[in-house]
Structures are given as C-alpha cells and as structure tokens.
From Swiss-Prot:
Gene (name only): ccmE
Entries under HAMAP family matching the protein: CcmE (MF_01959)
Keywords: Cell inner membrane, Cell membrane, Cytochrome c-type biogenesis, Heme, Iron, Membrane, Metal-binding, Signal-anchor, Transmembrane, Transmembrane helix
Organism expressing this protein natively: Nitrobacter hamburgensis (strain DSM 10229 / NCIMB 13809 / X14)
Pfam families, alphabetized: CcmE (PF03100)
GO biological process: cytochrome complex assembly
Protein name as catalogued: Cytochrome c-type biogenesis protein CcmE
Residues in compartment: Periplasmic: 29-162
Length: 162
C-alpha cells in the first residue's frame, strides 16, 4: 500500500467514525430537540407512562379546579386534542384559563399528565409590574409598552400524590 493510499484510508476511516458518532448523538438527543409536545403529539407518539417530557398548549376554559394542599387540575388543549394535568404547587402569576402553558412531568398509568413544573407563557410585550411602576414614577412610561404581565416559573418538586 502506498503512502497516498494509507492516507486516503485513514481519512475515509476517520470520516466513517465521525459519521457514526454524529448519528449516535443525534439519535440520543432526538426527543430533546422539541421544546414541548402538544396533546396531539402525545397521542400520536404513544408516550409511555413515566417517561418525562414537556407538555405545551392552552389551558382549556372551564377546566381549572383548585383542590386541597395546593393540588390543581386543568386540561391542556392544542385545538385538536386535550390532556388532563395535575400539579401540586404554587402556580405562576400569569397562569389562567385560555393562557399558554408549558408543563414538565410524566404521564401516569391512567393517562393523566403529572406535572412537577409549570411555566405560564407570555407575549413579547411583557413587562414586570415593578418595572412598569418605576417607569411611570420617573415619567418614562409610554402607552405602547403594552399590558403589564409577568411569567414566573413554579416548581413543586415535592411531587403529586393522590
């Protein structure tokens, strides 16, 4: 084998190893690439109970029920499908029916999503109340800043028990 053939063999072998490594990494990260799954995606992919993922959609109107010990149940909808959610903890300030939400947790054996983290989504015009008040006090407030809103992450790591 000549020197040129050995060099080409080494380059070709290195490219094959690199391609295999890239395929393995992409396969391992396949489920993490999507920030959240919608209720339709959950039903189409038949996610196994206990598998952690993020669920996103709108809190369905009329579905919010506050129980004892900070337990809250609601339904997340994407317009086509709906998934029941149970969460134990303090909800974000912006959490309300009809508002966008991303919850992290897992499905239980009965098909209820048990969330341990809930994020309320907001639009790009968000401004914390404290900042808006400070701007108004200093005379720098502009009416085109939009409505005052806030998004706060709530994490109830103690879990949900029923």
């Amino acid at each position: 084998m000549t020197r040129k053939q050995r060099r080409l063999t080494m380059i070709g072998g290195s490219l094959v190893v690199l391609a295999i490594a890239a395929a393995l990494v992409l396969n391992a990260l396949r489920d993490s690439i999507v920030f959240f799954s919608t209720p339709v995606m959950v039903s189409e992919h038949h996610i196994q109970p206990g598998q952690r993922f993020r669920l996103g959609g709108l809190v369905q109107n009329g579905s919010l029920v506050r129980g004892d010990n900070l337990v809250v149940t609601f339904k997340v909808s994407d317009g086509s499908a709906t998934l029941p959610v149970t969460y134990k903890g303090i909800l974000p300030d912006l959490f309300r029916e009809g508002q966008g939400v991303v919850a992290e947790g897992a499905l239980d054996s009965s098909g209820v999503f048990r969330a341990d983290t809930v994020l309320a989504k907001h639009d790009e015009t968000y401004m914390p109340k404290e900042v808006a008040d400070a701007l108004k006090k200093q005379g720098h407030w502009k009416d085109d800043y939009g409505p005052q809103a806030g998004a706060v992450e709530a994490s109830g790591k103690q879990g949900v028990s029923q």
